[in-house]
Amino acid sequence: MASRLANVAIGVVLAITALSPAWAQGPGRGRGAEPPPPYRPAAGAKDLRSVLFNWTWYMGMLRGVDEHELVSSLEYQGKGTIQVDGQPCTLTKYRVSTSYQVSGQRVQYTCTRPNGRTVSNIEVVNGEYAWNEDIPGAELVAGKGNATPMPAAVQERLIRLWASPQGAPKAAIMAAAPSAELGANPGTLFKDGEMKAGETSLSWENGKPVITYPIPGVPGATATATLNEKYMAERVVVKQGAKTTEFIYGDYKDWNNPLNKIDALYAGKVTERHNGTVARDLTTDQTETGSVYVIMPVPASVRAAIHPAAPETLPKFELASAAPQGQTPRRADGHPDMTGNWNSAGMNWRYGNRRCDPTQQEGCSRALNQTMDFEFEAPSRFGPNRPEYKPEFWDKVQQLDEWTNKDDPVMTCQPLGNPRQGPPRRIVQSDKDIIFFYTQYADGGGGNNEYRIVPTDGRKHDPQKAIEATYYGYTVGNWEGDTLVLDSISFVDTTWLARGGFFHSDQMHVIEKLTRTGNGIKYEVTVDDPEVFVQPWVMTPKILTLNTNPEAGILAERADCEVYETKDISSQIRH
């Protein structure tokens, strides 16, 4: 799988939730009972609510028992012809990496003109910035590649993104409910009978639903999407002044890797016309839906050259958590007391057995859907915040993600390690040290009731102790005001930072900061790895809340761990 991050500063603070509803658990807890869907259109419904729901539902974009819209990215490969400088060019390579969460897309192509000349280019857009690259990730590392600012191309590239088979329903929903939570089910956002919400409207023409919505980030650009009988876009027309861009789509099916069929549909035929002239005529070879590492960091030279005109029109994916309440308890030494049981942050949806959608293949079952959807729902697989690897490592991350069932260390019972383990479930603090207790199922799976004992007396790293590499690193702690700072070095290089192939070297350096305010702890992590990162990765902060349940501190004994799969992998459905 592939996925690409952008350097756009978008914060996503994840809300706290339960992992599994009762009906998704074991015997005696309702196993086999079918949960009610969050929304089911009435028979014959022709309002905006039902059409937007069906559009995403039939496309396979709704995931999990609550049927959230969780398709965050797409890797696309195709063939055909494109227009280059007014001449047709036959493609020998055409790859598109799209991140819907950051309004970003990278198009890499190589083609041959009628005169035999080969043309190659890399066209990138990230929000309000557009540029061309001579190599992927040009200029991110000093002296490697050249990035050419292309301010005049921003609007054309954003139109292509937000008029695409998956981008169009996303843009229509965002325009209809701009304040909706990240990944909301469209059926829960509107009222029955509405034909217009926000800037999105619905009409019916020749028995087909027609959705009209604005293109994000492109002032004055209005898209009209005509859906077929299966609620998939067959034609999207974007008008902006005197320019008309038309997209024709057909042959929808699951084009994902045969080893990772996840019933997420995409168009097999794509035709793009500019004022009637064919600009791109493509046939799909393969897609990877929901790729975890799709990034397009903006080079400094591009930021300096382009001055955004209307960034406020771009989608912002943000979730806020409640502010901590109450007084902050302190120890006799004056430091905040971290002792207690804590609820860690996860996503705001539930795992479970999703009902089969209308276009799923024969043999679909709720149990299969639960396995299939996990790669969309796992906390560290969602959200736009990604480490910025050096470009030469991008393909390695994608390949590790493709074979995560074989390569993820957790599949062979290795500890999650730091920082993947995440925040502790229980903390015991003394004058000279602090003890962290962890539970299973950190990172939405894995972990095995580990613990750490960290000195907090302000000592420095001892070079002799730093010789030995461990899963959680050699950690020392000190207080900076009311913030406890943990400094960790000397890691093994066999753990991952998160799901999705986020590997690291043995030069990784991790700084954790814990700040207690009232009944909450703000948990912040910065990861530096000069061997593989362009710059330190500041992970999305998590807010821990005090759990006052007297049973919360009772942790199960360390469980047995079973190696889940052998090297003979018959499926790439990611965990």
Where do the protein language model's features map onto the residues?
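PEST-like low-complexity, intrinsically disordered acidic/proline/serine-rich tracts
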Residues: Q25-E205, P216-G217, A221, V238-D251, ...
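A short glycine-rich beta-turn/N-cap micro-motif
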Residues: V102-R106, K208-P209, K230-R235, D254-K269
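Short conserved beta-strand segments at catalytic cores or DNA/RNA-binding microdomains
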Residues: A225-L227
